[in-house]
Amino acid sequence: MMLRSCYRPLERCFGKLRSDALMWHMDLKPHSSGDFSIAVVQANSALEDQGQVISSPFATFVGVYDGHGGPEASRFVNSRLFPHLHKFVMEQGGLSPEVIKKAFDATEEEFLHLVKRSWTAKPQIASVGSCCLVGAITGDMLYVANLGDSRAVLGRKGEGRGGSGGDLEMKVVAERMSTDHNVAAEEVRKELVDLHPDDSHIVVYTRGVWRIKGIIQVSRSIGDVYLKKPEFSRDPLFQQFIAPVPLKRAVMTAEPSIRSRKLRQQDLFIIFASDGLWEQLSDQAAVEIVFKHPRAGIAKRLVRAALHEAAKKREMRYDDIKRIEKGIRRHFHDDITVIVIFLDHQQRSSRFNKLSSFDCTSAPVDIFSLNSVEAEDTLRSRG
């Protein structure tokens, strides 16, 4: 009983921790121009995804950071990118693609300094990185910036005929708002080949997928310093942990793709998610799930739909996957972060009055620790 009362404040702060022990979710919460829903499921031994929503009376900011090689880079981006963005917004007097790029550049530069400071004690930090997806809604403008293969997909009203050519009925249309920087796409491979005409191994098909230098699938990120700064990959200290990578120049960048457009009345919602979701669901399938179901818990519903698909591919049930422990579960699906932002155009002015200050919602750094026996033991030891 006492343990349960200890957990109640955790649930109020972080959301619900039920059913799937590796899933966390917050069903519904207001932002400056609507509601949002967020859910995360952990597959790796340490959660490598991070997600956050920051809302003020005048703007909403969304971040999804999908780490690789470890959780350090995504956690770093989670703590540093929005402070940089806020600083440049204040300096420049507003949000713009240039301001967003400055924030990405500053975050990359700060992480590089961290790697240099930590290098001798932890050389592996040069091999960690993170995809970075950011959305910003201010007034009637939407900005989406991306590094890597997390994705933002907007759902907007469309019309179509009912069955057998019947009356027009309201449908939802998926509009991709971000650019995937993954060498699975032919245009990304071509871009790399054009940039590295003297390197016949710049993109290699290995272990069933295309990879840069046979190592990594994404071409843009925060971190991955050893693939951006050749001196790190050549250092004997680093080579104790990772095989040397012969580089003449950087093979990855931190140059974000940025898109901005005015929001329209037919724009209903935006799904921001790490690639763990998009590996299992198409853009159209995802927006139809959101369109056809209640708002509360919709991010959790999307995550569960993805997990059902992952289970089906292995001729399993989702209930079977739920029983698999962290780490081993990564063989069945990736960490998944989903944030659904609803756009209530007519309610924007009333929302301003309800949100009198900044409100930040972040997914837990590690979900397993919030659900585990170790967490219960820790609470008992403090009691």
What function would you assign to each model-found segment?
Residues 1-383:
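PP2C/PPM-type serine/threonine phosphatase catalytic core
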